[in-house]
Amino acid sequence: MRNQEEFVLTEGRSWCISSWLPSWCPTSLSHLIKSEDRILKPIKVKFTQGYVPISNGNYIWTLGFNEVECSSDLSITGVQQLKVPLVLLHGFGGGVGLWVKNLSAFAGEGRPVYALDMLGFGRSSRPTFGRDAKDAEEQFVQSLEDWRKAEGLEHMILLGHDLGGYVSTAYALKYPHRLKHLVLVEPWGFAARPNVQERWIPIWIKAFGAAMNPFNPLGPLRLAGPLGPLLLQLLRSDFKQKYASVFADDTVADYIYHVNAQTASGETAFKNMTIPYGWPQHPMMDQVEKISPSLPMTFIYGSRSSIEGQSGKAIQEMRPNSQTKIIVIQGAGHYVFADQSEDFNQAVLKICNNEC
């Protein structure tokens, strides 16, 4: 892992609308760094942070826990067994900072834990993605495999939330032998768009969707310019409540703003992977049967989430001779890991400990 200062000149300034209007959005790389430092401050265990170089001159921003001296278990034969690393992939519009309520718990038992800003998000490289959905998907997958090689991990427990769940599944399809367990938290992109969808969507929503189609999903946040931070606080005031046990101010909203007001990259890839209105071009339900039957899978849903949980049940039925579990966290919404962090942490630790 490289020093965090090494790529500052490579990243340059993040311009949110165009190179001739850099000051429209009140953000920059330094703002993002400061907001990330603030959101990670409550973590009391030691960790490293830095850029991991991958192919095509890109890099992945990574937090690492227990990398050098990880705890080990002694089996009844006296052979030392290292714990399998846990790797976390955030969802759309997220970043490493949103795991602040989970990282200390995950790393507390000595297990190597890594949290990544996915390619195109957070402090990772923001390259141009392919316009084809499959090309964009492959770029995400290859960046993860490049990162794994750079970190020297033979195997890992891969946990993905939302878009991170989709990318994790795509990775499992291509590199199943690298995974000990696939954990999908409220994963996006599994179900196909229902045929009845068009019938019940109001005309005004269809018109608005058509008008916004040329723009990236987070374009309005940038177009709002100096009002962007306030707009985010108003529209997503729920995040303050989700993290109220950790922060009394707008630390989380500030972090989310600076993560998403940077140059569009990962969100462009996401847009290229979708069809109206946010449904996947290539639903994972059509591909999941190809996943190795020997790979254990666990789906984690929130009981109050708007994400449909039928995909997990359907996949469980598809894999009658494979280990496929479904966990529902009571009282949690889409951001399960923030809404009910203690229950979520316990569930994930149990999965990890079963894999060593």
Question: Where do the PLM segments sit?
Answer:
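Gly/Ala-rich beta-loop-alpha elbow adjacent to hydrolase catalytic centers
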Residues: 160-164, 168
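Alpha/beta-hydrolase active-site loop signature
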Residues: 93, 118-122, 189, 306, ...
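Active-site glycine-rich loops that stabilize anionic/oxyanionic intermediates
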Residues: 83, 91-95, 162
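Serine-hydrolase catalytic-loop signature spanning alpha/beta hydrolases and amidase-signature enzymes
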Residues: 91-101, 113
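Flexible "cap/lid" subdomain of the alpha/beta-hydrolase fold that forms the substrate-access gate
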Residues: 2-45, 82-83, 134-142, 149-159, ...
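Active-site loop/oxyanion-hole signature of alpha/beta-hydrolase fold enzymes
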Residues: 53-58, 65-80, 108, 114, ...
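Catalytic histidine-centered segment of alpha/beta-hydrolase-like enzymes
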Residues: 332-346
